Each structure stands twice: as structure tokens, then as C-alpha cells.
Amino acid sequence: MKAALAGKSSTVASAQADWNARIRAVSPASVDAPFVSNHDMARARGMLRSKVPNEKAAALLYLLMPGVPTVYYGEELGMSGSGSDENKRLPMVWSSDAATQCKAPAAADQAQRLTDGVAEQDSDPDSLLNWYRQLIALRNLAPELTRGEMTALDGGNDAICAYTVTDAGSTVAIISNVSQKDTLTVSLDVLRGAELLGGIGGAAFADGTANLPPLSGMIVRLP
């Protein structure tokens, strides 16, 4: 989340690759379960300063990581909650109509600040909910991401997170730009001859070069 806030993600890949290697050294069959929030910690929205672009940047990074990313309910909407455990477990916001929500835990001392629920965000193509949907669909194009071995790449810019993931002889590269203002290009020898599987945020790929608008990413399969 620090990388998402700062718009600097170049060290994320190397740190995650090192972590995955440490896991496999202990248990070769294990897979990581990346997350940014769960029921025992303050919700990601508060830590990301309640700004949707920051939330999108964090999701862009962790939902394309190797392993089995875990989304805590309501995170994909931007639900808030911190302090006592009950505040972190407030009812799902299905719509702006309070009648659609369950009762809050009895000991909760915070009210849910989010007003736009599933119903409202569902019809907004730029909503956080639809961003999560697009990222999950993108991830599903690369089965290598579940159990593959991760290797960090140097994307040439602090805002670029780049790495490869290899499983069963097949390798994909993930390249993401967490800058919220700069369009960046990435040209690496390893990308020559690669095939674009899919992208998000207007990312484009041609002749071994990734063109990445602010908050965008892609997956390519290497030859």
C-alpha cells in the first residue's frame, strides 16, 4: 500500500519474489495469498486515504501477484472501517438504500461512510468495483499466476512494477504502471516476440514495447 500511495512500485516485485522464494524453501508446494485487508485489520480504504485512484493502484499491484489473492468483502467497493474488530466487519453495502443492509455488529462504534454500493457502482464503468472485476478477468487469462515462480524485472522507472512468472514451461510477464499522472513505456529484451494476453487502463503492446498510461497494466506471454 505504501507503493500505491507513493506511486513507486519498482521494489515491489523484487520484495515479493524474495518472499515467494522463502515460502517455497520451506514448503515447495505452497502458494502465497496476497491481500491488502482482512477482518483483523483496518480496511484498506482508510490506509489509502479514501481515494479511489490509490485503491486502484493497490489492487493493480496485488491482484496480479503470483498465488491466490484474497479480496475482503467490500474492499472492492471502498468500504471503510477501523479500530475495533466490529468496525472492520460492518454490513456489505449492496446499495445506497439502507434497507438493503444487514444490521451492524452490536459493539460497532463507527458508521459505514461509503454511500455508493454494488447497485450504484455496477453501472459506473470507472468504479472501483468494475476495476476489480477487470483485474480479476485479466488475471484469469494467465493460469501461470497461481503456482508459478516469480522473477523481478527492471522496468526502468520507479512507477513500474515488472516481473515474470513461470509454471510448467510457460512464462508470462506482468508490467504495471502505478503512476497516477505519467504515461510510461517499457522496452525489455525479454519482451521481444511476446504475445499480449490482455491489459487494463488502456495499456498497449507492440513490437516488444509496453505503452502504459497512468494506472494501467498488462500480461504478455513470452515466446
Report the location of each language-model feature.
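Beta-strand-rich binding/interaction modules
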Residues: 182-201
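Residues immediately flanking
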Residues: 38, 77, 177-178, 222
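C-terminal beta-strand-rich structural cap/linker in extracellular carbohydrate-active enzymes
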Residues: 206-223
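Short, conserved catalytic or adaptor-binding loops enriched in Gly and charged residues
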Residues: 23-27, 153-154, 189
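Loop/helix patches that line or flank the sugar-binding groove of alpha-linked glycan CAZymes
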Residues: 14-18, 29, 43-172, 178-183
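Glycan-processing catalytic domains of CAZymes
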Residues: 1-27
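Aromatic- and acid-rich polysaccharide-binding/catalytic face
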Residues: 1-6, 32-42
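A residue-level signal for conserved active-site and pocket-lining positions in enzyme catalytic cores
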Residues: 39, 135, 215
